[in-house]
């Protein structure tokens, strides 16, 4: 570490989540393909919960929605903040892909993707409120498809399962 620091590196960022799990995780390109397939194939709204901090994943979801003529509604403060930061820094270029919940009311369900927080079952996150029926702007529809685009952080399985059970 001292050698790297002496070479001018000022910050090392690392993620050790699931580092004790054996084997390999899927490549991000495999995940990207699966997300694109879902967005393309589903005839209803697609609700994707993912980590707001994963800008690369957000960017791919946005590109898949553009390719498949879907507009995006974002829910969750951290998601909205991450999108705004990415737009302001040129990481995401097309602001017109984003709409609000009122604009979506007049659209075909196949033309809408909802990007939200709540992959870990956090009780106040957007997905939990959607699942509980307490979200002020959106309710689940029979043809909605909910995608958890994340892995469970150890210790969160029970909270995640509670949200999944409420989605049924």
Regions found by a protein language model. Give the residues of each.
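Aromatic- and Gly/Pro-rich donor/ligand-binding loops
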Residues: 118-119, 150-154
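Conserved two-lobed SF2 helicase motor
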Residues: 111-120
């Amino acid at each position: 570490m001292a050698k790297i620091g002496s070479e001018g590196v000022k910050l090392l960022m690392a993620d050790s989540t699931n580092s004790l799990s054996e084997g390999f995780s899927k490549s991000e390109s495999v995940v990207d393909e699966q997300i694109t397939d879902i967005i393309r194939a589903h005839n209803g709204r697609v609700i994707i919960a993912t980590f707001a901090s994963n800008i690369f994943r957000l960017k791919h979801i946005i590109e898949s929605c553009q390719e498949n003529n879907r507009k995006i509604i974002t829910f969750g403060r951290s998601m909205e903040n991450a999108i705004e930061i990415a737009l302001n820094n040129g990481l995401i270029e097309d602001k017109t892909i984003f709409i609000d919940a009122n604009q979506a009311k007049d659209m075909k369900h196949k033309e809408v993707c909802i990007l939200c927080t709540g992959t870990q079952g956090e009780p106040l996150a957007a997905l939990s409120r959607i699942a509980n029926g307490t979200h002020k702007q959106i309710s689940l529809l029979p043809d909605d498809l909910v995608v958890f685009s994340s892995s469970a952080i150890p210790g969160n399985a029970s909270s995640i399962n509670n949200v999944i059970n409420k989605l049924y």
